[in-house]
Every structure is written in structure tokens, then in C-alpha cells.
């Protein structure tokens, strides 16, 4: 997934994985807020994150669920309805490629409201791009933009990645790569 650290659409509909990846690092989440990024979710994602029955909830999962509830009480990550007509409008149902309702509804709702979609699912990101949607973004892209624009410093990189790993998330390598891309982009912009 190619990213440009100099550009990031600040208003995004987040899918389930992105919600967890953003909230996995309090430092990343705080920097995104400071940069005036705004994230919302669809009711499908809300269900997957907080309502869907689970056999058991690991402590790190409970922590992320608690963080999401706290953010929602503060007005962030608000849930919005996405109807079947929204999904049909972009012919997503025919192109599902084993995507879940959370990813599909996030793409459809983002297109409907003409805002960004943030997904860390490669197939969902590709579907959004293939549908001609310019604002398909990822958590590593957000991270690289925050580094590039100076909202996160070089010293924050290890903190964000460590917090991410401690929360049981799995994109540490992508975050490291995004960090390196942001440094290269910053170097190129001053040359």
C-alpha cells in the first residue's frame, strides 16, 4: 500500500481493525486528535467492536473496548447508520472478496459522505482504490503523516510501536516502514 506522508485526509470512517490500531497507542490517538483528525464508525463496526458476542475477552481487548467507549463518550468515533442501498450504490456486494460488513459499510459510508476511509485490511483498501476512491487510507499512513508534519517526533516512534504491540495488535512492521517513508519524504522535501 503506497502512502504519501505529506497528505492525509483528516476526516475518516474507520473499520474495526483501524479503530483498534488507532486506539492501541494512546500517543498515536492523542497526536491524531491534536492534528484535528476525526474518526467515525458505521453501526456495523460499532457492533463488531462492542456488541458482538465473544467466547472470551482478553485483557488487552477489554482495554481497547474501554478506550473506544471513553472516546465515544467524548464525542469521537460516533456510530452512523449505513443502509443496504449505500452498499449497493458502489456495487460492493458483488465484489465482496470475503470482506466483512464492517469493512464494506465503512467504504460505502465514506463514499456516501465524501470523506476518507481508514482501513488496515489490504483487500478493503484495494477495493476502495479500485472503486476510484481517492481517500482510502491506513493507520500506518496516519502515523507517517503525523511524523512528517511534526505532530509526532522521532522519539515517539518507539512509544507508539511498543504501545501497539502491548495492546496485542499486529502492524508494528508496517508502522516501522511508514516511519522510514516519512523520514525519506521529509528529507526529499528539504533537498
State what each model feature region is:
Residues 2-109, 113-115, 122-137, 141-145, ...:
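Active-site-proximal, substrate-binding regions of enzyme catalytic domains
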